[in-house]
Amino acid sequence: NVWKVGSGDCFVAHFAHGWMHDGLAPADAARAASFAAAFYCAKQRLPTRDDLASCTFPPIAVSQNYASGQRPQVYLAGPFFDLAQVWMVEQARATLKALGLRVFSPYHDIGLGSADDVVEKDLQGIRDSDMLFAIADGLDAGTIYEIGYARAIGKPVVVYSERLTEENLKMMQGSGCIICTNYTTAMYSALWEAAKL
């Protein structure tokens, strides 16, 4: 889980302590402060010196393509049948774009229509995308199908669900989807997954 509220405060406090109190060079103080902020985001508490000495985090893998500026396209799957669902799709699209990713959203890029009008375009959108981000709350049949289709053709999938049970998510968990139960973690997970591509 990623808990980012207060992470900036944690970074600043540890940076100042490392630089002004411990006499670290600014780059070293920033490195130590980044680690402290990562601990805070993951554990939802301020780290002690013992915490920082004994805790390790795996590095985020970044592909050569991503490092050279290429940005993967994310297919945004999710229901859009009422105001709350449309708002969530809008919010997810805006956040993914703010993270620097390209987004294909059936709601925005295809629109509403009959099965004959939209299904093949949706599937082509999945094929043309590098990964899929799914808003799964509500167990929308179309979203579930898109998740399965993406996994069947080898696309990474990040599933965001705050209300579904483990039983509801069993097939997604078992097929290698990354399951996230809060919005912030889901967004960062999508970014970290995209950075690998």
PLM regions and their residue ranges:
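Short, well-ordered alpha-helix to beta-strand connector turns
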Residues: 100, 128-130, 175-176
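Short acidic-hydrophobic, aromatic-tinged amphipathic segments that line or gate anion-handling sites
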Residues: 175-190
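Short, glycine/polar-rich helix-capping loops at beta-to-alpha or helix-loop-helix junctions
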Residues: 162-174
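TIR-domain catalytic/interaction hotspot
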Residues: 111-134, 142-146
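Short, well-ordered beta-strand core segments
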Residues: 132-133, 157, 178-179
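Conserved phosphate-binding/catalytic region of the ribokinase-like
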Residues: 1-69
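Amphipathic helical hotspot of TIR/SEFIR-family domains
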Residues: 138-159
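Charged C-terminal helix
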Residues: 38-84, 88, 92-97, 106-111
